[in-house]
Structure formats: C-alpha cells, structure tokens
C-alpha cells in the first residue's frame, strides 16, 4: 500500500516574510483572552529578532536552550510550564530557531493534548490526539524539521523521533533573511544534514520517483551553495532544506543518521556535526557522496573532531550500538531487507571505533 502522508498545510517563502507572522496568527486567535506561545532559540535574546516577534497581550515568549540535544525531560518541563500558566490551552505554538527548537516546539504542541511523558510517544504513530496549531520558522536551514513528521528527542532509553502525522507543522515561514547571520561552522553542519539526507535517500532501497525528484533538486542546491558562490545562497539553502525534507518524507535516511543517533544519545553530540563525523567514515557505502563532502569541508575550512570514541567505556559503546539498531527502517532503506546479515553489531562497533 502506498503511503498517504501529511504535508505542511501552508507555506510562505521570501525575504522579509517574517513580517507577515502577525497577520497569519491573527486569524488563529480565538478571543482577546487567548494567547500564543513563542518558543525562540535563546541565542536571539539580545538580537534584533527579539523585537520583531509579534507578542500580544497575554502571549508568552519562552527562550529555549538547545546547548544540549532535545530531551524528553525538557519537553515535558516546558509543556508543564505552559499548562501551569493558564487554565486554557494556547491558540498556537510558534517555534523560531534551528531544527532542535522546531522539534521542541512540535513536541510541546503534541504534549499539550496528549497525556504522560513525551518519552511514551517515541516511535511510529503512537500519538492519539491532534496537536494544537503550530508554526515553524527556521533560523538555520538543513535539518528539514520544518516539513518533517518527526520530532527527534533523547529519552531515558533511546534517541528516537515522535513520528506522527500530528507532528507536522500547520504553517511554516521560510525567510532567508533569518539564516543570513548563522555562524560558519553551524551553517555548514546543518547544511550537511540536508546534503546527507539526499545522499541517503537517493541511494536507498525505498527510493521512488517522488523522493527522487525532491532529493535530486535538494542535492543540486546543496552543491551550488557549498561548492559554489552566489548572493542568493541563503535562499537556495532554505529551499534545499525544504526539498530534502520532502524527499525523505516518502523514503528514508540511512546508515549515517542511524549511527549519528547513537553518538548523540551517548556523547551528547549535536545532530548536524554528528552526521558529519559519521559520514566521513562511510566511503564504502556512499563513495561519491563522501568524496563531495570532503571537498566541501576543505573548501569551507571545516575541521571535524576526531578520536571521540577512542577509550570509551565498553558499556557506553554497546549503548551506542543499541540506539543505532533500534532504527530499523533506516537500515532497511540503506541495505535492504537482509540488512541484519550485513550490518552486524561487530560491524557497527568497528565503524564507531574509527570515529
């Protein structure tokens, strides 16, 4: 059976379109007493963006810290904070930031209408109730979080997304002006998340004409951005992220993302840089992609951390392997239905020990 997947309902793209946010939200406000919750990356606390957020009356602005990978405990605490502040639910959650902030905003919008801990919903299609209205506004591009049906969280036992049609944003605003000032390394790592999405999707067993069309376009845009120059590179990167996210919506990612989840869960390494660390050792699986990736790192003077796993305690290494192996759809996409015969625990251990 073919997948009938949920897409973002409304999209605005263009330089300066952030200024339309107030008007978009006005149509969603139920009364003068209702409120919106803006969840904004705390790196913007002393920036001009702070003054552009259209906070009204009883609206709440929550500064979200993503120094660490998003955790279920943090999502649960933010959800409780909002519930404690009012007897009514907000009219909407607006996530403004990179992939981690957008994932947190998506998770909170789900947990406001679903009971228990967000850890209970890590997996596929476990969410029972529709989320409240939620909007995504990226200030970094590459993760595809603005269009994905997942919100990736580290829980007590595993790093895994809340994968659900209810997770998908109702509205996104793609304003290239918002990503213009990103630090060089962070921009690169996040952009490579998109590039690696595309390589894994285009080389996967789940590939189809839908995912191929979006994946090839996103891959081409990534090459223009990171192997070329141009005044519209922010626009291209933002659209690459969108198209890359759409590509994996109808296929899957692969080996790099599975191994990166293990690094992130055990060592706390952020997703973008984690993908880059892992991908550099996957030439046997994605030879052309890794060669181009290394060309990009050299061109942008990126120096990846080394020897992260050297000397790590054996129980932590085994936990990395456990976390990676949970992600069965990723392995099947990369290696086929017989992937367990190809990617053994010992093979994964060998790959991690190189990093």
For each predicted feature, which ranges?
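ATP/NTP phosphate-donor binding region
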Residues: 1-92
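Carboxylate- and glycine-rich phosphate/diphosphate-binding segment that chelates Mg2+/Mn2+
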Residues: 151-250
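Short glycine/serine/threonine-rich phosphate/pyrophosphate-binding segments
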Residues: 18-22, 45-49, 100-106, 144-147, ...
